[in-house]
């Protein structure tokens, strides 16, 4: 925890004045604004280049504050909050009156979570309100997991950056729609489907597609500058070396099954065998291959179970079709 108490107090003052603060969470760094200040929330969208229809997540200091932000707290939502907060779980519920439509993309629902990071929790306590925050990066690009990532990408557009060190989880929160009787996962993340089912006692669905009612649902998202190509694990070396021969500067995500295999490429990332370590390092790996000048990244998807589901989701979207410029 690098941020001092004086830094956190200053950051809280910035939020009260309508400014933007980048702050660490256990998942990624957030770009925060006073959730009840429509002008400050609008500036978040402006700085990120984020479409106004894409809702933000409101970060609160504890589960006891949830009822202040939503119309009602169903029993299922209360159960999940008690088990997973603070932590990488976001609940989508009916919007309460104090939430401005600017923070919800005009929807009648709101996304809320309690982050599990000492700096974030101290900031929320010092500020005394909710902080609306997406990831602290340009819309569609790789999420930041260090304060330096934020500074490099957003620079002076952020009024204050709190440095809390590298993020422990490394991928965004799991988003659960808890508005109905049976919850569903709208975005996989740091809390696994298996974790949720163990608490709920019944299976939950993970839709293959989603409308833009939660963050991270654009076809191309979490994307580095380099193009990302997905292949089967056994074809990674062949495809990477072919692309290198054709003149690309190729970066390779080498899976554990090929850890000792030689590969002719511009840069190689050895994918950790631990899914927790992979999630923690994923965005840093993508940024590093960009930094090393790769224009093409060859990767495969992990098994889509546990944290592998969230990792596969992020890599698949990083490889998604990009808007024409």
Residue ranges and their predicted role:
Residues 1-325:
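Active-site-adjacent structural elements in enzyme catalytic cores
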